[in-house]
Structure formats: C-alpha cells, structure tokens
C-alpha cells in the first residue's frame, strides 16, 4: 500500500491486516433467530450463517440496521459448504451513530457461495463514531478467504455499494485472500458484470482509503462481463494485488471490459496496482481508467517482476492537484510484460512529475494499435516514454506524444531510453514539446537515447519543439529514423550524438542516422557530434535543412534538389563541419558580406576527410558588404577533393541598390581545395533607375507647366475680354524611363492696369506615371502672376512669375520592389517678346522669343526599404524661339505654331544610401534642345 496521506503509511497497512484477522474470528451478531429455518426465500435482519453442508435458497434478502462489531450479512464457512441462491441476493447493512467493521458477504474456509442471479450488496456506514477498536473501521463488500469461492452468475450484473461517513475508515469492494492454496485451490470469484461503488456521490468525503478489488496471496477473479469501479476517498486503488506472506503465489484477473474512476480527495490514487510476483491481469476488450488525486497518481502500476498483463484498447486519464514534487504515472512496470490495443494517456499535474509510460528492468510493453500521449504538468519533469535497463517498448500503430508545461526549470522528454533498453515505432510518430510563451529555461528533448539504448522509427517522424531545444540526442545510445526511406521526416531542434559512460563504467558512443528523402521532409536546428560518435544525415529528393547555428556531422548527404540552408540562423555566420560529404547536385545556401567580430566574411563548409565527386550549387544570401567579402576572397568551402566542384547558382541581391554576379575560384591547399569568392560584378537594380528617374519626372512636369499661360496671354493680345477665366487640358510626357499622362485645371482673373493687362491664376496638375517596372503619381499645385504690355506696333511683352509645389510617389514592382514618396518647391520667371505682322486677308505672322529661369529645390526621402534618396537643387534656364501663323475671323481665329527650345542649364545630382550600406550617386544633365509644334484656335461664343 502506498502512502496515501498523512495518516496512511506503514501503520495503516498493519491496521488493515489486523482488522482482517479480527474480522475472521469474532462475530457478535453471527447467530440470529432468522438462521433457524430454511425456506425458498430467505429474509432476515441478522447474519445468515451457513456451515457444514451448506444451504439452498431462491432469493436471499438481508437487512441489518446498526449491526454490531465485526458483523457480516452472510457468512459461509466449512469445507463442503455450498450456499446457493437461485434468485437475487440482496444484503443491506446500515448504521447512523456508532460504526464498526463490516463484511457484506464473507465466504471462508473452503466454502462456496453460488449466487446465480448475482448480488446487490449495500453498506451505508453513515455513522461517524468509530467503535471498531481499530484505527480504521473497515468495510468489505464481498470478502473471500482460505480457498473460498464465489460464483455471481452471468445472467444479471452484480452491484456492490459502500458508503462511509467515518473519517477513520477504509473499504474494499471485493477482498480476496487465497492464503497460498496453490493453483486450482485459490480463493476465487467469477461471474458476469460487476459494479463496485465506494463513496460515489457521497457528500461526506472523509474515508481514509478505498479499493475496488483486492487480490492477495494467490487469488483469482474471472468475469465474463465488465468490471466497473467508482471510488472516492482520501486514497484509492481501483484494483490491488499482492502476495503479502507467501512466495510463489499468483493472483489472476480476467474481465471483458474494465472501467475505473478514482478520486483521491486527500491522498494518492491508482487504477491498477499489482505488487505480487508473476501476477496476471487480462482485459479482453477495453480498459478505461480515470484517477484524480492530491498526491501520487498512477494509472497502471506494476511494482513487481514477472507480471503479465493484457488490457485491450486502453484509455488512462490522470490528474494530480498538488504543488508538491510527487509522481503521476500512466503505465509503470518492473520486469514485466504487458500488451495493449490502442493506448491513450492524458496526464495533468499542478506540481507533480509526470511519466506517461515507465518501463524498468527486462520487461516489455507491446502496443499493438495507436499510441496517444498528452502530458501537461508543472513539476520537475514531464515524460512521454521512459525505458530503462533492458526494457523494450514496441508501438505497432501511429504514435502521437505531446509533453508540455509552464515550469520554467523543468525537463521534458518525448522518449527517454537508457541502459540497453529499446523503443521501436513501426508506423508514423509525432512528438511535440511545448512551454510558455517568451524566453524559457525549460530543457526540452524530443528523443533522448543513452548508454546503449536504441530508439528506432521505421517510418515517418515529426518532432515539434517549443523553444527549439533538442529534437533528438544520442548520448551513448542510438537513434535511427526512416532507414528504409519513403516517409516524411520533420524535425525541429538540435540533433546530437556524444559519448557517455554506462552503469558498468564503459564508454559508449552515440549514433544518429536520419534519412530525409521526401520533398516534405526537413530539419530545422543545429547538429553536433563528439569524437567517436556518429551523426549521419541524408537529404535527398527535395528535402532541406534550415541550419540554426554551428553544426558538425560525421556524414552528410545532399542530393539533387535538396538544400542545406546555412542562413537560417539570422545575424551570424555559421560553420558546418563534416567528416564525409556525399553530394550530387545539392545546394548550399550561405551568407556572405561584411566582416563579423571573428573576422569572417561568410558561412563556411569544412570537409575534414572525404568528399564525393560532383558539382554542388552555392546560393549566396547577403545583407550587404559583398564587395568587402570579394576583396578579401571569403572562403566558402574548405577541404574539398579535387573532383568536388562548387558553383554560384544565381546573381545576388542584397536588398540594396545592386545585383551582384559572383564567380568562385578554387585554391589548392595541402592536397585539398578551398572555394573562395574570386570576382564580383555589379549592376544597379531597376528600383534605382525608377527612383533616379523620378527627378526627371518632376523636372519635365514643371518645365512643361511653364508654357501653360501662353495661351491666355495670346488670347488677351488677340482682343479677348479680360476677367474671370478657366481652362482644362491634358497631355502626355514621356521618354525611355517613364510616361506621364496628366490633366491640368486652370482658373484665373485678369484686368486692365494702365497700359498693362495683369492677372493671377492657380493651376493643379494631376499625372499618372508608368515606369518599366512600376507606377506612380505626379501632382503640381502652383500660383502664377502674369502681365502683358501691348505695343502700338503690334508687339507684346509678357512676364510670368510662378511658384508651386511638386508631389510624387512611386510603387516599384517585382524582385526589387520598393515604395517612396517625395515633395519639393519650385519657382520660375519667364519673359517673352513677340510682334505680329499682317499678311493680308486677316492672315498674320507672329515671331516670338522667350527666356525662362526656373529652380526646383533639392529634396530627400527614405523609401520603404530604408533607401535614403537625396537630390540637389536643379536650376533651369531655357530659351525659346518660335513663330505663330494664323487667320482671324469675326468670332475668333485658328493658328499653327512651332518653337525650338534649348536648356542652357538643367544640371543636378542624386545620391542614394541603402540600409545595407550600398551607395549610388549620379550627375543628371537635362540640357537639351527640342522642338514644339501645335495647332489651335480661339472662338467667341454668344
């Protein structure tokens, strides 16, 4: 018996045994008047006691109120005594004040009870004053001793109900003590369905201890039906078996379906607790056990050697509510053999340690179906499977093991094996370890194999590791995964192999062999090995490795389509050291760029022994500094054989301003070859072209707008009325770099001022941009002041002063995508002289000359990718010579015009600085000569 609470220890064990002895020798209520006559039906209020040659009845009904010390409802004894009831046996014992030790039915002394329609046995111990003379008042529902036998029949299920309000009391639903009689002469019970309820739904939960079935010293229970047990007490055992005084005895249990619910309200509890050597338990169909406890909680606890058990499809649900360092065990056994169909274990603890399956010694656990473990606890450790000292666990079906908890200092194992033990998974397995969010000090291991232990996964394996702890560690043990191939392997966390001394002080070396050979297979983590150990990883058929830190292997295979990504550990260069490289068209992804604190310019692959012939691709990833890496001939691969080749697979874009073309060079080094960055070429990416070209957009739009008032001034010169006016027009600007479709809205007011016509106008231009690989917007808002002086010789002098603000944005598509927006101010002053000549028939000719000075203020902005872009001030000085020819009508005129323009200035510069340190600068010269032609007219309406 375990330590169930503060009251129950070795003292309770002694008291229980003493109570059993006392109960078998003294019955103060044994002889009652009801025993004097036999009848077809027996009804009595005292003990029905049968001896000698027994008795036969139809129905037996015993009702005893406030029975005395050591009473029994039915007591049978005697070597040839068979008491038979052809109908239901009903026994009810009740007390309300003083309470004693009771047996509902006691079958003793080689006697037999044959209850063909089963029993209905109830003990209602409502009294709380213990007068038994013992530390605990005992209650036994059905008690069988000294080769006694009970047959409950199979027609109707039997029910045993025991309630006790006394704090100092304990109960056994069925208690069988074989007294070492030997095979064939055991104390035994058989029948169909049996239900045992102890303190079920009883408000007074004070009972010290309850056991559903107790088998001692060579006892046997054989039920053709189901056994259903419900227990609530300070401490509980669903089924308990032991050989207390004799060696060589065997207790056996046989049922069809087993269901146990146990609630230990102030102590520990177990579902099945087998303590006798070579005991046997066989559940043919299914086992369901749920235990809630305040201290230790066990599902199936086999605490002896040579025990055999078969439990069918098994479901264990275990909860410990204590914050103390106690234990929760799903299946625990020593040097014994058990079998299961499907096995499901759900374990929870507030502070107890959890081991879902624990196998110690040379025993076996054979799970013929699927295994599902969900263990979540806050103790010192949480384990899925633990196999020790030659133990062997086999899982034939799929396995899903999840362990987790919130204790920041705990240790978690999905599978833990040591000292020549073996754990084998024949089908796909999944192992998940979880902890709280954020930083955690929890040590998490998917698989841990130590000191000559072997863990094998014949098919697929998935290991999800909550804080990227260890996926699998072989510390003197062995782990093999997917050796036959064809299954998905998905690992997160460290994979390592190292040496360790076993219990015989012999040094054992770790071995890890993993075959990643499907496109869905991957490894995300780092790998290590120590001298003498083996770490062999094979990547083929599109599988990949995201390497999370410096790694070492004995053997690495990277086949065609598979990738080793050394850039997965962001912020640092990584080293991959292998003894032997087997590769054929594999790809290594490496970081290269600016020097780090250790003097490295790149990740590095080091081959210590052998490398296979073939050409491997290297894909460079960089965040900047590639030019420095090239100048220093960064070493990417060290120690390759002469026929092991490497080549850069693609150009490199470092998320900056350039795309780099890298060429590798091999350098002989002591008979081996190092592969280094040999040469580097670069070209600007199209985002640079677009951002650089945006200045051209601003310049073109502003210059184009300088001539938009010429039409209004021409109208005034042609005699148009002054006053309020408005115009809407559109156009298209473009070149090799962009096209800008725009619309312009103008309105203004002008009036006569002496010899001058003067006015003011506001204009808004809205442009839509298309780049080779992007789009954008261009907007201008400006205010103009203008005046025209009409000479008497048909000459005119026009002056325009303009001030505005330019807005622009760009959205760059594709591989080099980026976004940016800018704004700046602009100013222009223009002077134009023209003179009109009459050609007759209302035809006129008008030569024109114009000078315009403009300025676009410098500006800067930062793109979404962090590129700092700055433009200098742009000064413009444009001269124009033109001619207009037209014909006047009574309501207006029509004309054609042509001009030649030249930019005498138009110089600026642009600089860019990317977040990765790459820089770009260019001078921009917009000086040019161009031609403008047009046709138009003016019509007066009304």
Q: Can you annotate each of these PLM segments?
A:
Residues 210, 269, 382, 412, ...:
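Transmembrane beta-barrel architecture of outer membranes
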Residues 772, 809-813, 857-865, 906-912:
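Outer-membrane beta-barrel and related beta-rich outer-membrane complex signature
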């Amino acid at each position: 018996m375990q330590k169930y609470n503060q009251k129950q220890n070795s003292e309770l064990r002694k008291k229980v045994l003493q109570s059993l002895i006392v109960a078998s020798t003294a019955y103060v209520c044994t002889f009652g008047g009801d025993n004097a006559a036999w009848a077809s039906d027996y009804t009595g209020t005292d003990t029905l006691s049968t001896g000698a040659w027994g008795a036969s009845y139809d129905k037996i009904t015993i009702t005893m109120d406030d029975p005395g010390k050591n009473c029994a409802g039915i007591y049978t004894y005697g070597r040839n005594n068979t008491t038979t009831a052809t109908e239901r046996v009903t026994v009810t014992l009740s007390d309300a004040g003083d309470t004693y030790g009771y047996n509902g039915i006691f079958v003793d002394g080689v006697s037999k009870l044959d209850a063909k329609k089963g029993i209905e046995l109830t003990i209602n111990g409502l009294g709380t004053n213990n007068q038994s003379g013992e530390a605990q008042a005992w209650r036994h529902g059905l008690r069988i001793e000294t080769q006694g036998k009970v047959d409950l029949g199979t027609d109707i299920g039997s029910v045993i109900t025991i309630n006790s309000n006394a704090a100092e009391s304990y109960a056994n639903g069925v208690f069988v003590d074989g007294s070492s009689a030997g095979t064939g002469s055991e104390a035994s019970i058989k029948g169909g369905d049996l239900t045992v309820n102890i303190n079920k739904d009883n408000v007074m939960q004070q009972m010290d201890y309850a056991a559903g079935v107790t088998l001692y010293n060579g006892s046997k229970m054989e039920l053709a039906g189901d056994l259903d047990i419900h227990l609530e007490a300070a401490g509980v055992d669903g089924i308990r078996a032991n050989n207390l005084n004799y060696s060589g005895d065997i207790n056996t249990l046989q049922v069809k379906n087993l269901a146990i619910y146990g609630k230990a309200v102030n102590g520990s509890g177990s579902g099945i607790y087998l303590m006798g050597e070579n005991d046997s338990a066989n559940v043919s169909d299914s086992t369901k056990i749920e235990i809630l406890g305040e201290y230790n909680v066990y599902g199936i606890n086999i605490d002896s050697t040579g025990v055999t058990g078969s439990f069918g499809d098994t479901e264990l649900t275990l909860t410990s509510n204590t914050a103390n360092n106690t234990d929760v065990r799903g299946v625990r056994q020593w040097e014994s053999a058990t079998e299961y169909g499907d096995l499901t274990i759900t374990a929870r603890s507030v502070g107890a340690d959890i081991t879902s399956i624990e196998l110690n010694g040379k025993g076996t656990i054979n799970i013929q179906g699927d295994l599902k473990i969900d263990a979540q606890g806050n103790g010192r450790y949480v384990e899925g499977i633990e196999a020790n000292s030659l133990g062997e666990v086999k899982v034939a079906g799929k396995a899903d093991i999840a362990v987790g908890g919130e204790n920041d200092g705990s240790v978690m194992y999905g599978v833990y094996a040591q000292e020549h033990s073996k754990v084998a998974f024949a089908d796909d397995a999944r192992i998940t370890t979880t902890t709280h969010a954020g930083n955690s000090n929890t040590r998490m291991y998917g698989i841990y194999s130590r000191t000559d232990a072997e863990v094998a996964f014949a098919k697929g394996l998935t290991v999800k590791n909550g804080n990227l702890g260890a996926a699998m560690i072989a510390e003197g043990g062995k782990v093999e995964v997917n050796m036959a191939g064809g299954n998905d392997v998905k690992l997160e966390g460290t994979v390592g192999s190292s040496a360790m001394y076993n219990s015989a002080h012999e040094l054992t070396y770790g071995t890890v062999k993993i075959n990643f050979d499907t496109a869905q297979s991957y490894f995300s983590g780092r790998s290590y090995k120590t001298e003498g150990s083996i770490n062999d990883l094979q990547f083929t058929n599109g599988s990949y490795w995201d390497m999370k830190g410096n790694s070492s292997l004995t053997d690495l295979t990277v086949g065609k389509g598979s990738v080793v990504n050394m850039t997965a550990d962001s912020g640092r260069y990584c080293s991959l050291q292998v003894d032997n490289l087997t590769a054929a068209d594999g790809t290594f992804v490496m970081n290269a760029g600016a020097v780090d604190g250790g003097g490295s310019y790149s990740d590095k692959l080091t081959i210590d022994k052998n490398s296979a012939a073939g050409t491997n691709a290297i894909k460079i990833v960089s965040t900047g500094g590639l030019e420095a890496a090239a100048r220093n001939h960064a070493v990417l691969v060290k120690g390759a054989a002469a026929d092991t080749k490497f080549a850069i697979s693609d150009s490199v874009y470092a998320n900056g301003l350039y795309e780099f073309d890298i060429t590798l060079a091999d350098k002989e080094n002591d008979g081996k070859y190092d592969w280094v960055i040999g040469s580097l070429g670069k070209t600007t990416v199209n985002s640079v072209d677009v951002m650089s070209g945006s200045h051209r957009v601003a310049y073109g739009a502003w210059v184009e707008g300088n001539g938009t008032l010429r039409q209004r001034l021409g109208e005034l010169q042609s005699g148009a009325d002054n006053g309020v006016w408005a115009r809407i027009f559109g156009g298209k600007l473009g070149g090799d770099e962009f096209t800008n479709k725009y619309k312009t809205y103008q309105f203004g007011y002008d009036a006569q001022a002496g010899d001058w016509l003067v006015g003011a106008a506001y204009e808004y231009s809205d442009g839509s941009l298309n780049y080779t690989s992007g789009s954008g917007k261009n907007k201008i808002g400006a205010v103009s002041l203008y005046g025209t002086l009409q000479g008497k010789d048909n000459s005119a002098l026009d002056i325009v002063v303009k001030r505005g603000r330019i807005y622009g944005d760009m959205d760059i598509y594709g591989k080099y995508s980026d976004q940016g927006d800018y704004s700046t101010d602009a100013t222009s002053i223009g002077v134009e002289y023209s003179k009109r000549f009459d050609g007759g028939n209302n035809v006129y000719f008008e030569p024109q000359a114009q000078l315009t000075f403009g300025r676009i203020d410098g500006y800067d902005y930062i793109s979404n990718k962090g590129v700092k872009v700055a433009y200098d001030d742009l000064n413009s000085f444009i001269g124009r010579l033109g001619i207009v020819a037209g014909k006047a009508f009574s309501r207006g005129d029509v004309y054609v015009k042509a001009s030649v323009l030249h930019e005498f200035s138009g110089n600026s510069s642009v600089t860019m600085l990317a977040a990765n340190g790459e820089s770009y600068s260019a001078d921009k010269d917009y000086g040019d000569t161009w031609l403008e032609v047009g046709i138009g007219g003016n019509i007066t309406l009304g």
